[in-house]
């Protein structure tokens, strides 16, 4: 079973997350940050990963700790659910168009965390949500999920569309990478013999 549950409690956040890599994209996300919940819904739906996420954060300060720590916990849950990564495709990439926005995401579940980020936003906020937190989330996800992740904006003028296209592009890339490879069902997808 490719499932995992993570609980993470700090002075800033109290998080529980469960993932099922062989799900259907069901989600139940409650972080207290409306726009971020909407983005996480998109991530689950388009990755076909069932995600339940609860976060009690210090939102009286700002959204930063909540968003970043959810990325940390989700990355840890993905790592645990993938186990030794035997039989997965490992790589994924996707170009996602959403109205004016076109975003490319490519990733490798290599165990070597790295983020290449070329996603400038035309505004600093989407409603009350700081657009810089999109990068913070993906940095935390990549670092704690052991993911090499590239996200590039090819075109876009609307910050909401850019953010949503990024979450969906990463989701579709993740969906491809975690998918079992029927031709290599028992193999680690690396010439090193481990990831």
UniProtKB/Swiss-Prot annotation:
Which Pfam families does the protein's record reference? IGPD
Q: Single GO cellular component annotation?
A: cytoplasm
Q: Which GO terms describe its biological process?
A: L-histidine biosynthetic process
Task: Give the chief site where it resides.
Answer: cytoplasm
Cellular compartments annotated? Cytoplasm
Pathway, per UniProt? Amino-acid biosynthesis; L-histidine biosynthesis; L-histidine from 5-phospho-alpha-D-ribose 1-diphosphate: step 6/9
The record's HAMAP family line, in alphabetical order, gives:
HisB
Protein family: Belongs to the imidazoleglycerol-phosphate dehydratase family.
Q: What is this protein called?
A: Imidazoleglycerol-phosphate dehydratase
Q: Which organism is it from?
A: Cereibacter sphaeroides (strain ATCC 17023 / DSM 158 / JCM 6121 / CCUG 31486 / LMG 2827 / NBRC 12203 / NCIMB 8253 / ATH 2.4.1.)
């Amino acid at each position: 079973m490719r499932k995992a549950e993570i609980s993470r409690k700090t002075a800033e956040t109290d998080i529980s997350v469960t993932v099922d890599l062989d799900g259907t994209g069901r989600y139940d996300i409650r972080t207290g940050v409306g726009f971020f919940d909407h983005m996480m819904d998109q991530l689950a739906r388009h990755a076909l990963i069932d995600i339940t996420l609860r976060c009690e954060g210090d939102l009286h300060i700002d959204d930063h700790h909540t968003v970043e720590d959810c990325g940390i916990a989700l990355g840890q849950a993905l790592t645990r659910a993938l186990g030794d990564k035997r039989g997965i495709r490992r790589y994924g990439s996707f170009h996602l168009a959403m109205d004016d926005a076109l975003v490319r995401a490519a990733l490798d579940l290599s165990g070597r965390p790295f983020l290449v980020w070329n996603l400038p936003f035309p505004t600093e906020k989407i409603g009350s949500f700081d657009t810089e937190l999109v990068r913070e989330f993906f940095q935390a996800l990549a670092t704690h999920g052991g993911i090499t992740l590239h996200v590039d904006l090819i075109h876009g003028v609307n910050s909401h569309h850019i953010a949503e296209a990024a979450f969906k592009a990463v989701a579709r890339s993740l969906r491809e990478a975690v998918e079992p490879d029927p031709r290599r069902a028992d193999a680690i997808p690396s010439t090193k013999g481990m990831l």
